């Protein structure tokens, strides 16, 4: 697979991603699979700028750390929508069973669009024998985010929403912004998502505005408001 060969990984790591790819191919529908690979590809693009290209001047230890962060990001991207292969009742049951390990309320579990992340992390962990907390956290919160997100989780949150298969009014501008300033892009993508939810008359995740305030606290000064 060309997309695997393009990843900045060791041969052993590429083989691991290749194995994940073969397994998800068996269970994802064509739309889910295309979105997964497109999300991974956009993660690769952003990671090159914000993870891999940042490491050479920081010493060998930090280069190794950056490569490890990047590998975990690739795994999370491959599995971020694993929960979508299950029906909502199953997802809700798994999420409710594990609610003590989620930053959510029982009411949040009535929001269908976030269940696949919350429950999918536990299901992917079990199915693919993934015990790494950072990978599972990336999967768990890729739809909603959390306060003080890591660079990898900023990347997967953004990539999921602006990968090349997405088509909505602001997406081209957001892609351009993502290559220039990841933090300002996070602010704009999060804002765009809140506006979409409100305009759709849908319930909002209980932590949304705390997360929004946290993003604004650090990055709000970077923005001049809406760009036309």
Could you tell me what each predicted segment is?
Residues 28-32, 99, 181, 201, ...:
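Glycine-centered secondary-structure boundary/capping sites
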């Amino acid at each position: 697979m060309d997309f695997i060969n393009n990843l900045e990984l060791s041969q052993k790591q590429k083989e691991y991603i290749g194995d994940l790819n073969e397994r998800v191919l068996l269970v994802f529908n064509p739309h889910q699979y295309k979105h997964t690979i497109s999300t991974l590809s956009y993660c690769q693009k952003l990671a090159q700028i914000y993870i891999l290209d940042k490491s050479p001047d920081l010493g060998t230890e930090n280069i190794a750390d950056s490569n490890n962060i990047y590998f975990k990001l690739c795994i999370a991207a491959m599995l971020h929508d694993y929960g979508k292969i299950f029906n909502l009742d199953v997802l809700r049951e798994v999420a409710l069973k594990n609610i003590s390990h989620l930053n959510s309320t029982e009411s949040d579990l009535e929001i269908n669009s976030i269940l696949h992340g919350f429950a999918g992390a536990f299901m992917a962990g079990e199915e693919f024998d993934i015990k790494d907390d950072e990978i599972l956290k990336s999967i768990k919160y890729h739809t909603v985010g959390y306060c003080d997100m890591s660079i990898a989780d900023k990347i997967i949150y953004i990539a999921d929403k602006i990968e090349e298969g997405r088509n909505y009014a602001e997406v081209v501008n957001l892609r351009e912004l993502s290559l220039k300033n990841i933090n300002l892009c996070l602010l704009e993508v999060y804002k765009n998502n809140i506006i979409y939810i409100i305009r759709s008359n849908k319930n909002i995740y209980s932590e949304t505005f705390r997360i929004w305030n946290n993003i604004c606290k650090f990055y709000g000064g970077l923005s001049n408001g809406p760009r036309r």
